Amino acid sequence: MSEKSEKIYEAVTNISDELVESAGAKRKRPRRAWYISAVAAVLVVVIAAALFKPGGSALAIAEAAYDGHERLPDDISAPDGCFEALTAQFLSGAGDENAVLSPVNIYMALAMLAELTDGESRAQLLELIGIDSVEALREQAAAIWKAGSGESDECTSLLASSIWLRDDIGYVQDTMDTLADVYYASSYRGRMGTAELDKAIQGWLNEQTRGLLEEQAASIKTDPLTVLLLAATLYYSAQWTSEFNEELNYTDLFHAPSGDVDAEYMYAGKFMDYYSGEGWGAVRLSLRGGHAMWFILPEEGVSADALLEDAEVMRLMSTGEADGGEYAKVYLSVPKFDIVSQLDLIDGLKALGVTDVFDPAVSDFTPMTADSDEIYVSDATHAARVKIDEEGVEAAAFTVLEPGDTAPMPPELEIHFTLDRPFLFSVVTDDGLPLFAGVVNTP
């Protein structure tokens, strides 16, 4: 067992009030009110068994040791096809509702689930992820974890994961070690279906997401048939590199599918690249830390769902890559928004070819435990929240509006880019990892 694994599995204690209040892998980090973008995501996979045996109330607690941020190596490819498939599947059909997800967060949970399975159950997960073997998956997942995690004064992106074990079942130690070593999974053991354990799980989720998803976390509960609960989270915040001036904000109509609503718009005139394709236009706003937020606006008469079937749009949202940008003076109006959604992933994952893990008659969880049969995934819940505003943005050290000897000539093209109808967005790292993607139907 590695040193990291020993740290994660060495402690066994009873549930205490302090644990329930603060269960989780804590990081000492300041709370900064000046972040303009705060987003969080959580995915919970509940694995249940058809058989139940009562047990004690001991809870094993340990905290994962997180390595520092590293760029994605050149020889590691991100699972762009998986990111695109997840984004299209779970953002389509939102109707009048807003929808948001974290492709990276879902990917990490699916990768951990692949470690717990074998046979066709694992093969279906690997096919969706787009990788040939679990060994290659581990290398990819570890690299993505390090590339997607980091904290500085400019940008915070924090991944976390945990496994919650039933106290009357034995688990395969090698598999638990892998979850600790590759996925930095903190481990907990307790009596499933109790209010104490549920409160500890909810407390861990709230700790990792800084309380942004408290209502959604409160809905996560175990029952006596739960064999293992797997949780993966992502918290993110960053500053714009060029601020919006609050004095320029204005209120106007947003043409939502269900009817016009008032929205508060942030406004700026910026020199930037403008991207367009058949039925859409897009702009990229830079975030400190090298990240970016993309806004994709369908043309009049084109729906957001239609763009989710556009290969070029999906590549842009999933990788941050786009062709054919034109340098322009863009008059940009962006509605302030705070959107949250909670998704049941089971039907969508089945549509993407992952079926066996949900069927106790055919699922294969032998890498996890030999103590129970007919094990299956009974619940797969993903919650995410994204909010943006203009507050607290520091003045940029440099800006494209500042004249200089090497600045490009003023563009002839002028674009009025007003997000006053349903639009898509994504938050992408400098490595091309899609941390968040969403559709705003009503800001």
Locate predicted features.
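Post-signal peptide N-terminal segment of secreted/secretory-pathway proteins
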Residues: Q89-S157
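Non-catalytic, conformational "gating/processing" segments within enzyme and secreted inhibitor domains
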Residues: S57-A62, D96, V134-G301, A322-P410
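Internal signal-anchor transmembrane helix that establishes type II topology
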Residues: K28-L51
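Short Gly/aromatic-enriched secondary-structure transition segments
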Residues: L125-I129, F244-L253, A304-M314
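Disordered, charged N-terminal biogenesis/targeting segments of membrane/secreted proteins
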Residues: M1-R29
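Sec-dependent signal peptide cleavage junction
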Residues: A48-Y66
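Feature captures eukaryotic membrane-trafficking machinery centered on endolysosomal pathways
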Residues: F83, N98-R122, R284, P411-P443
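Acidic/histidine-rich, surface-exposed loop or edge segments in extracytoplasmic proteins
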Residues: A64-R71, V104-M108, E120-E127, T178-Y188, ...
